[in-house]
Amino acid sequence: MMAKQVVVLLALLLLLPIVTASMGDASGRTGRIYMYGTSIQDLFRYLQLDYQRNVFLLRFLLGRGGLLLH
């Protein structure tokens, strides 16, 4: 159980620079990553999920056919 949480946290740490870099780009060159990054952040904000449910949702999104990479 603990190993899964570590893997999820590592995946989140790897995705954060991509999301933040794309959000800082006003030209729209990284449109796809920007779209997925903001949609996930908005989803967390609107649902007001706690940390464990955020990790579960992130694991779900990453596990379903690589949603973030398409």
UniProtKB/Swiss-Prot annotation:
One GO molecular-function entry: toxin activity
Tissue expression pattern: Expressed by the venom duct.
Residue ranges annotated as propeptide in the record: 22-32
Signal peptide: 1-21
Annotated Gene Ontology cellular component terms: extracellular region
Main location: secreted
Keywords noted in UniProt: Ion channel impairing toxin, Neurotoxin, Secreted, Signal, Toxin
Subcellular location(s) of the protein: Secreted
Further comment: The mature peptide does not contain cysteine residues.
Protein task: Acts as a neurotoxin by inhibiting an ion channel.
The protein's name in its UniProt record: Turripeptide OL179
